[in-house]
Regions:
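Short, low-complexity S/T/E/D/G/P-rich linear segments that nucleate or cap local secondary structure
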Residues: 1-4, 11
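C-terminal regions of RecA-like/P-loop NTPase motor modules
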Residues: 242-334
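P-loop NTPase motor domains
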Residues: 26, 30-37, 44, 51-233, ...
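H-loop/switch region of ABC-family ATPase nucleotide-binding domains
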Residues: 239
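Short, acidic/turn-prone active-site loops that include or flank metal/cofactor-
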Residues: 44-47, 266-268
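Short, charged, surface-exposed secondary-structure boundary motifs
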Residues: 48-54, 270-275
Length: 334
C-alpha cells in the first residue's frame, strides 16, 4: 500500500506469529476502499493485471534506466529459474542481452502499446543460439503460456491513485514470492514518479520475511529498501514470522537502514535472538513478554522506549481495520 507523504521515516514492525491477527495485505482492502483508494487484486482468477516489465523515464537516476530494470528482471528470473545456486553466468548474460533487445521499440517510441511483456522476453530468449537461453525460456513458459500466466499482461489498472493496495492473498506460496517481488518493482516505479513531482511515498510491505527468505530476492530487496529511502520513499516492513526474518543474511542490513523499529509481544525464542541483535536489556525485554494488545518497545536510533497504544474501539476506523474474527463479522453486518 502506498501514498505520497511529506515525511521520511523507515520502519520495521515485528509481531508475534499466531492468533487471530493475520498478517496479510488483504486486511487493508476495507480501509483503502473507505478512503477511495485503489485495491488491485492479484490472483490467478483476477482480471486486474500489473506488468512486471513496466518502466518509466525516471526509473533510475542514471542516464540509462534499463540497467536497473535489467537487474530486477534478473532477480525475477533467478526466482523462477535459479534454484539454490541461482542463475549461471551464461544465463545472466543472455537474459541481459534479451532485456536490451525487447525494450528498443519502447524507448524509440515510449507509448503504452510498445511496453514489452514477459512473453517478449520469452520469445527473445528462444531466438538466441545458446542452450542456456532455451533453458531459461522453458522455465518461463508456464508464466507465459501456462496456468501461471497472470503476469504476462500489460497493466490495466490505475496505479496512480493516492492510495494503492496490492492484494496478493490468493496467490499460492511460490507465486506469492514472485508477486511480492513484482509489486516491489511497481512501487519503485511509483516512488520515482513521485520523486520527480517533489512527493514522498509511503510503502507498507506485509509478510516481509518472504522476500528475505530466498537468497535470490533478499539482496535485491535490501538494495530496493536502501534506494527507497534515498529517493524519498518511506518503507515499512511488517512480519509475524520473526524467526524467518532473523534467519536471513540480509536482516542486519534492514535493521541498519531502518530509523525506527516497533516490537510487539514476542515468543521466548525470538526474544533472545532479538535481544542479542538489537542489544535489549532483560528489563526492556519484559515489555514484549506476555504483553497486551498495543504494548511493546519502540526503537528510535539509540533510544529504546516502552509504549502503550490503546486505539479507541468505538470509532469507524477501528471497525474497518479490526481483524478479530467476531468483530469482523459484526462490522460486516453493520
Amino acid at each position: 500500500m502506498l501514498e505520497p507523504y511529506d515525511g521520511k521515516l523507515s520502519r520495521t514492525v515485528l509481531r508475534r506469529e499466531g492468533g487471530g491477527n493475520t498478517a496479510d495485505p488483504a486486511d487493508y482492502s476495507p480501509l483503502v476502499n473507505r478512503l477511495k483508494g485503489q485495491v488491485i487484486k492479484i490472483s490467478p482468477n483476477s482480471t486486474q493485471f500489473i506488468n512486471p516489465m513496466d518502466i518509466n523515464a525516471n526509473y533510475s537516476e542514471e542516464d540509462n534506466p534499463l540497467s536497473l530494470k535489467a537487474d530486477f528482471i534478473l532477480s525475477l528470473c533467478e526466482l523462477v529459474v535459479g534454484g539454490k545456486e541461482g542463475l549461471l553466468p551464461v544465463e545472466k548474460t543472455v537474459i541481459d542481452r534479451c532485456v536490451h533487445l525487447i525494450y528498443r521499440k519502447y524507448f524509440a517510441d515510449p507509448c503504452p502499446e510498445n511496453m514489452p511483456i514477459l512473453e517478449d522476453l520469452y520469445n527473445a530468449l528462444l531466438q538466441q543460439d545458446e542452450k542456456e537461453a532455451h533453458h531459461v525460456a522453458t522455465a518461463l513458459e508456464i508464466y507465459v503460456k501456462g496456468s501461471l500466466n497472470l503476469f504476462n499482461h500489460r497493466t490495466n489498472v490505475n496505479v496512480n491513485n493516492r492510495i494503492v493496495c496490492y492484494d496478493i492473498k490468493e496467490l499460492g506460496k511460490q507465486m506469492k514470492k514472485l508477486g511480492m517481488l513484482i509489486v516491489q518493482d511497481q512501487v519503485w516505479g511509483r516512488v520515482t514518479a513521485n520523486r520527480s513531482s517533489g512527493k514522498s511515498t509511503r510503502y507498507y510491505m506485509d509478510e516481509m520475511h518472504l522476500l528475505l527468505k530466498e537468497e535470490q530476492t533478499a539482496a535485491y530487496s535490501v538494495e530496493i529498501w536502501k534506494r527507497f529511502r534515498k529517493w524519498g520513499g518511506v518503507p515499512t516492513g511488517l512480519t509475524q514470522n520473526v524467526k524467518d526474518l532473523l534467519s536471513s543474511r540480509e536482516v542486519e542490513n534492514i535493521f541498519e537502514n531502518s530509523d525506527m523499529i516497533i516490537m510487539l509481544n514476542q515468543a521466548a525464542g525470538d526474544r533472545q535472538i532479538l535481544a542479542k541483535q538489537l542489544n535489549i536489556s532483560p528489563h526492556q525485554l519484559s515489555y514484549v513478554t506476555h504483553s497486551g494488545e498495543g504494548e511493546g518497545l519502540l526503537f528510535f536510533g539509540n533510544v529504546i522506549l516502552p509504549f502503550v497504544d490503546r486505539f479507541p474501539t468505538d470509532l469507524e476506523l477501528y471497525r474497518i481495520m479490526t481483524t478479530k474474527l467476531g468483530e469482523v463479522s459484526e462490522g460486516a453486518q453493520k
